[in-house]
Each structure stands twice: as C-alpha cells, then as structure tokens.
C-alpha cells in the first residue's frame, strides 16, 4: 500500500469533472505505458504527476515492501487482480496470481479501491466500513474506486441507488440466506465433504460462464454502469491481458454481476483436529488422521443428549477423546492426558519447524476479520488484539503476526525473534497430503509386545509405547505396499500391536528396592551407575527368586488385562493373538509359554484346570493327587513318563531323548528295575557320556523320591478307618456329578488369577546350583506365534543347565516360534544349535523389504565366489603338475620312498579341493528357497518343523565397524521394515494370505 502523500486528502475535494477518468484522459495517453500508473486524488494533479519516477520508489510505505511486494517493476500483488477478471466459479481466490484486466498497471501496494475508501477502515478515527461504503456519495469524484469487474474498467456509479444500504449489512430480502457458519456445517454446506479442494483446483475443475445473480435477488440493472460513464478504451492502449479478454468467458458484453455476490464467494474454513504431544521433551501439535478428524467434526456438529459425556475412540481405538473437555486419554496404558483443539488458523515463527495452531477462541476472531476482508475486499488490515499481538492481512495469501514489543535492555536491544513477524496460515489444505488417512477400525490380528531391560527401548530414550507406535506405522506402510491387492479387496485390514510394560513393577513403593539400592550405590560416576541400576539389574532381578515371581506375575496379569480390555472394546474381533518380546522380554514370554497347560496333551489331576481363562470341572480319579506346578524345560520328560501306566526302558530313554543308548543298556541286560538301582559310577563304567549320565541320574533320583512318597501315602491310606474311606468316596462322587447337574455357564477367572499358589524357592538339582521355582499365571488365550527379537533365550537355558532341547519339544499352547536377530546384536543368541547340534545350518537370511539383498552383501558373495573359483583353479593346476611329476618319477626311478611322498602330496591336494567344494556349497538359506522345506523335521517341532533362527541383513555402513554399531543393532528392530514384513508375512500366512510384489 503506497504511502499517503501529504496533500492527498480524503478525495472529497477535486477539481476534476464527474465521470472523468484520470488514467485514460487525453493527456494520459501520451505517456509510455511501460511505467505503471498510480491514481491520485489531488486537485491539481497534472499528468506528469501520475507517473512514478524511479527516485520516488522510496516513497513506498512499509506495508508495500512487506512479503512479496518489493519494487515497482514487479508484478502487481494478488489483491489487484482479485476482482479484475471474470470468476468462473464462486471461489474468491480463483483468479489470484493472474494478471489484472485493467487498462493500466496499478502501482505496487495500491489497492483496487482508491485511497479514500481503503484508508478509512484502517484509521483510528470515527470512520468505519459502513460509512466508507454508504450510498450517500451523490457525485462521482476523481478518486472514486475503479471497479474493474468482468474486464470493464469503470468507477462505481454515482447514483445514490447504485449501492443498496444493505450492501455491507443485511442481505436483500429476496436473497436466500446461505447459512454459512465457519465453525458448524449445515446440510446445505460442505458437510458431506468437509475437505474442499483449494480454490485454484476449483477454478480449473469447474470452468464455465460466470455466476449470475439468483432470480430472487434484486434486478441486475441496479448495479449496471450508467451509459456513457466511461469513454471507450482504444485498442492500442489495452494491455496484453486485456486483449485476451474476448476469448475468456467474461467478455465485455456480459453483464456485471451484483456486488453482493462477492459476499457469497466467501467459503468457511475447513477445520482439522489436533492434539498436543510431548516428543523428546518438546510440545508438538500433531494432527489427527483424516478419518478421526472427520468423525470428531461430525460429532462436534451433531446434537448429543449429554454432550459432557461424549467420548470418541481415535487412533484405531487406542485413545479416547473427551470432546467436551478437549482432552485425549490413552485406553491401554498410563499416559498424561493431551490437549485437543479444533484448529483453523496456524502460525509459524523462524525457529518453528511446523505450524502451530491458535486457540479456538482466537481463531474465531481471525476468521471473522478474514470474512470481513473478503466480503469487502479490504486488505492491508492491521488488527490489534488485547493480548498485544498485531496481525496484518495483506491479501488472502500473505497474513503475518507481529509479537508484542518487549522493553529493550540497557543496551537498547530486544529479545531475539521479536523483530521478525510470524507467518499466519488459514486451514490445512496445502498439508493435507502429509496427514495420514487413518487406521481401519477392523483388526485382523493382535500382537502383545513385551519390552526388555530398563524403562527405555532405544538410543533416543523412548518408552516401549513410542517404539511400538513406530513399529505399527511401519507395518501400516508395508501393508499398503506388499498387501495392496488384498487390502483393496477387503481381505486384509491391519495388525494391532499393544505394548506390555512391566519395569514399573520393580520400582516405586511396591517393593522398596529402589530405596535399598540407592542406599548402597556409590556416589562416584553417578550417571553410569544410574544407567546400570535401571537396565542391567533387571537381568539380576529376573534370576532372583523373589523378583522373578514379581516380574512374571506383572507380565501375565498385564497381558490378560490388555486382552480383556481389547475384547471389550472390540467385541466383533475374531482374529488370532500372538506375542512378541524384545531382549529380556522374550525370555519372560518363553518361560510363561513353557509353563502353560494344554489339556489336549495332559490330564490335570486337580479338581480345576485352566485353559484360556475358562475354569472347567474335571472328574476325579480314585486316587487323589495334589496339583503340582508345571515342570521346567529340562524336566519335560517327567510329564511324559508320569502319563504312562507301564514304563519300559525304551520308553524311558525316548522320553529322556537318549534312545541311542538303548543298545548299550540292552547289552548289559539292564531293564527298568535295574536302571533305578544304577548309580553314577555304574553308568560311567558302561561308557555313558557325562550329559546323558546326569540326565539318567536325575531321573533315577526323582523317580525314587516319587516312589517313596507314593509308598508313604499308601501306608497312610491303609491306616485310615473304613468310615473315613466311605465319606471320602461319597464326597468324591458328589463333586464328580457337578458338571452334569449344573447348567450355569463356565465362569471366567479374574484377570491374572492363578488356581494354585506355590512358594518361591530354589529347587536344587544335580545340574548347576539350582533354578527358580515360580508359579506362572495362565493366559486367557492361546497365542498362535511367538516372535523373539534380539533374544538371549539360548544363553539363559544354557546357564540353567539345559544343554539341549528335544527335537519333539514344542510350547504347549503356541505352535509358532521365530528367533529374529541382527548379526551384530550382542545380546542375541541362536536356538537351532541347541536342537540339532550335529547339523551345521546357517540362519535364514531375512530378505530385504524391497525384494533383494543389500548391494554390499551381493558384492561380498560375488567376491567370495570369485576367490573360491580362483583357489579351486590354482589347486587343480597344482594337482595336475604333481600328477605330471609323479608320472615322470615313475618312469625314471623305482624308489618306493619317492612314490609314497608323491602320493601323500597328491592326497593333500585332493583333500583341499574337496574342502573348497564343500565350503562353496554352503550358502545362506533364504525362506523363499525350497531348501527351507528340505529341513522340515530336522530342526525340531518348536516352530512346527520350520526354521527358527532368522537373521537380518546388516547395512553397508555397519559392516565397516561392528563394535561401533553393536548397541544400535540391539535396538534397531522397532524401525526395521524387514522385521515388520516378516511378522506380517507369518501372521497373514495363518490366514492363507500371501504378499504380492512390493509396490514402490
């Protein structure tokens, strides 16, 4: 906006005659039109004063030189062409950015209306908008506002009746009220599609003739130009933009639309809902997904019987939004409530990386001022608010905010960042592509994720909740790329991952261990000791008989609680459930799953048996035995042996996985009775190795104790009176008839409840110092797959004295088991060598999510193959040379010693060659190869006969220094696309759904 001249006045006094165009008078046509014109309101304005010389460019005001308005040679601001072209739609922003259809270029910063009208609303005097545009202007003035509508350059008519009094007030009675409310949609507005395309797209998509006034409105001739008010513009004076006017829909022959139609071109802003989230100790405003925002807006605009109690689930049902209180709460875990806003206006400073929404009250004020500016075409508005902020609306695209000025210090400087304004933005149309579409409400599969040591799960010190959020986002992206066809067909929806947090059960006032450890911790290297107490001590806690029970109970109860809560919030869920554990969490899950009870495999001797949380009544046997805890992995043979009524030596050895020694016992004429009388020395003399010898000795000791216990019980029963036996038999008969007499449904155990309680102590065995005896809770479901990420299960089993896992062993209630690890992970260990120690198998290489190996791995294999070929060729040549020497020696000598030496060298060369061939055939297996199927039955039944160990591909930079990336490798699983894709493949494999080729 050009700076006002000292003698400008208000335009009321002028010596020019009415209807005279100062820009296109006879004197004005003599000037060069390469220099833009500025309309002035001086009484003695000479033609020469209409030009803006170069040295006068410094007269441009501060507002004109702001944001996009630089010099007089630049193109005119968007506000000048705002009403200069024919609008092909009702969009007020459709012509922004196009050249104006005026006869002369308007100077930079000059509004489409003259100074008297545009300046009045911005002054601090008593004049306002209604006075500035009142119909009391009875005579055409030299500074009258040029109205360049529809390509016709004219002034507003001088007749008093040309502008109705209700122009800027109420609309004429004949016009139907559109009912627009920028904060509440109506059936007549965009309720069906709240996200309207940007104005530029609307103009391109809906070309056509200009909008005509509705039939019920005032007659169009009310606003037609009076005949002869403007002289015709010569064709030589017309600008290039004007010469193209006849080709456009708005030709000069088209009638000028009513000015009140411009008010109808205002479109209310489309709101979007945001929530405040703390990320790395910073407050960030995150947008809800498009799906969630539409649901929130629909509920917001609807009428609810009890608005204070309206709760809407978002983020796939993991969060609840309390609409009345404007807060967002987590549904499955403890988290600080987050503030929720219905956002329409945003700002961004120099130091901000993203736009920050204004409060809803402040946004309403801005929207009201913006609507006033659009309907009246009055820009460069300076809006001052009581809080001290000043907002200037230069045009629809350039709106800035100035911070309230602070008091300068003794050096005369103010705070940083206050001299530069903030950029203000209306709506989120430009960033709509960056907002996620949202998660589908239907869930195909549920996965519980248990964290490892410490309260943090990655190098950014994030909790398990944030890490699982990242893993969930990665899985959703892979669904759209690798399961696109199934997703489009509706066969696939999504997989839900819920975190299980247990570290808090060790600290706090519940156990008091934090206070005790703090007392004994040395004051030196405080941070390092704090890190050790928070992380590494979890491993020691799990090996403690007291805290191991606490950890196991916490994990079991939390999983059951989350499962019950998920089923209550998703009653239509019919999918499967799996579990995943990272680091120590995988060991906790392995122990829990190893101690689950499967009624299909064993008969529980107690009155109650728990399976999937359902308490079932069982018939009593004649001989009542107290319920015993589930045996650990190294005692799993006892469960098989005890279920056999008649035990033979061969069956016992098979249960102990020692069937290969049956011939040795048979040779010594040892049967089952003789075996129970054998000692360790006897087994040693028979040539039994140490490992099997320990197993047999442990079995003999355990069996002898049980026989002794059974004998004592039999003696006690024999001493009981006949009357007591009859009462016991009657009681047994009554309890056995309960299932047939009771028709009430089976009752559910409370979440985390356990049938029996076992004291925590150590059970000492011959192997090692002893193991922790823990009572494990029964899960309320049977998991389909168990995923172990960076797992130390094999190492813990080894230090417990388990040197081998039986090939026939499997988890009682879980049929799938995948041990996934990074090659540089210092905490991960393999499991397959414990099952098949004699079979040298490399881990299955997990393919890259883009369908190929990493480049450095392919190069490494190529170089390895090339080196092997060169070495093999060299050995072949050497062998040929030695054969030639051998033949030459045979022809010229008969020495047997020389002959033996040559044969010895030839044999060594042959052995080297065979060794190279074997090494060349050893390649890393891939799950896509048929060789994976060749090993069915050879790697045990822990994963249903399939491979167990799966290794990720290392990155090229990680191969340079293994030690540098060791810690990062243990924490890389949360953002690994390869890991997430393997989980999705195996989960949907249970649903007979295979991935397609990656769509990138």
Swiss-Prot record:
Which InterPro entries does the record match to this protein? DDHD_dom, SAM, SAM/pointed_sf, SEC23IP_SAM, WWE_dom
Q: Which UniProt keywords apply?
A: Cytoplasmic vesicle, Endoplasmic reticulum, Membrane, Phosphoprotein
DDHD domain ranges (all copies): 779-989
Superkingdom, taxonomy of origin: Eukaryota
Q: Where is this region: Interaction with SEC23A?
A: 1-367
For membrane topology, the record states: Peripheral membrane protein
Q: Name one GO cellular component term.
A: ER to Golgi transport vesicle membrane
- The main location class comes to membrane
Q: Where is the composition biased (Pro residues)?
A: 207-218
Phosphoserine: modified positions? 737, 926
Q: Which residues form the SAM domain?
A: 644-707
- Which cell locations does it reside in? Cytoplasmic vesicle, COPII-coated vesicle membrane; Endoplasmic reticulum
Chain intervals for the UniProt region annotation (Disordered):
133-252, 716-748
Q: In which tissues is it expressed?
A: Ubiquitously expressed with stronger levels detected in heart, liver and skeletal muscle.
Single GO MF descriptor: phospholipase activity
Q: Where is the composition biased (Low complexity)?
A: 154-167, 235-246
Which Gene Ontology terms describe the biological processes this protein takes part in?
endoplasmic reticulum to Golgi vesicle-mediated transport; Golgi organization; intracellular protein transport
Give the family this protein belongs to, as stated in its UniProt record. Belongs to the PA-PLA1 family.
PANTHER family this protein is in?
A: PA-PL1 PHOSPHOLIPASE FAMILY (PTHR23509), SEC23-INTERACTING PROTEIN (PTHR23509:SF4)
What the protein does comes down to: Plays a role in the organization of endoplasmic reticulum exit sites. Specifically binds to phosphatidylinositol 3-phosphate (PI(3)P), phosphatidylinositol 4-phosphate (PI(4)P) and phosphatidylinositol 5-phosphate (PI(5)P).
Q: Self-association or partners: how does it assemble?
A: Interacts with SEC23A.
Q: What is this protein called?
A: SEC23-interacting protein
Organism of origin is: Homo sapiens
Per the record, the gene is: SEC23IP
